A protein has these predicted regions:
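A late C-terminal transmembrane helix in Major Facilitator Superfamily
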Residues: 163-194
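A membrane-interface helix-boundary motif in multi-pass transporters
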Residues: 104-107, 190-207
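Extracytoplasmic gate region of multi-pass secondary transporters
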Residues: 36-91, 150, 184-185
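Helix-to-loop junctions at the C-terminal end of transmembrane segments
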Residues: 90-103, 192-193
Length: 212
């Protein structure tokens, strides 16, 4: 604990916390959550992850119709495939984090965001005559990678805040991340109207880099 590591479950330090006063608990939350820079770094990272996710969900079908000439039905499948691949990616990220990285979820998040960055970049570079199936495949693979960090960042925050403050830490991270819904909707709509779709995806790539 003296070097900033979380308390282990069942240790004397954690058990003593059961007898603490309300003021002591508030001080614990202040130190472990609200004044913990790691929690805020995680919250900001999750904010960027959610921006990319909702940008694809909200604007992906519109882009495919307006810029690539896909039918509304074909473009609509983007959302369904994106979500299914996202669930698969989330489960895979959990296994990789436990088995390959021995619980070091931060490494899994970096790996996944690098995958998002790669496939969104490749998607942007595809010519307008690209087969629609390939377009959907690239967006689906992006979904596979982006849902892993979304799930694991909450786990990392819980570990940092300890079991006693895990819910509060997740609440802070979740609150900040969901602000991205408004930013994604309004921000990318403005960019597409004034600068074109190319800049929407360039902005998305920059945000994916920040999410790393």
């Amino acid at each position: 604990k003296s070097v900033g590591l979380p308390e282990l479950a069942g240790t004397k330090t954690e058990l003593d916390g059961k007898e603490e006063t309300s003021a002591e608990f508030k001080e614990f939350l202040r130190k472990k959550v609200f004044m913990n820079p790691i929690i805020w770094i995680l919250a900001i990272s999750d904010f960027f992850v959610y921006i990319v996710r909702f940008a694809i969900l909200d604007w992906g079908p519109t882009f495919l119709q307006e810029s690539r000439g896909l039918s509304s039905e074909m473009a609509g499948w983007t959302v369904a495939i994106f979500e299914v691949m996202g669930v698969c990616g989330m489960l895979t990220a959990g296994v990789i984090s436990d088995k390959l990285f021995k619980g070091r979820s931060q490494r899994t998040c970096v790996f996944c965001m690098a995958g998002v960055l790669l496939f969104i970049s490749l998607f942007v570079m595809l010519p307008e005559t690209t087969n629609p199936t390939l377009l959907l495949a690239f967006l689906a693979i992006s979904g596979f990678f982006i849902y892993g960090p979304q799930a694991l960042i909450g786990v990392i925050a819980s570990n940092q805040a300890t079991k006693k403050a895990a819910s509060t830490a997740n609440g802070v991270v979740g609150f900040v991340s969901y602000i991205s819904v408004a930013v994604s909707g309004v921000g990318f709509g403005f960019i597409s109207d004034h600068f074109g779709w190319q800049w929407v995806f360039i902005t998305m790539i920059v945000i994916a880099v920040l999410g790393l």
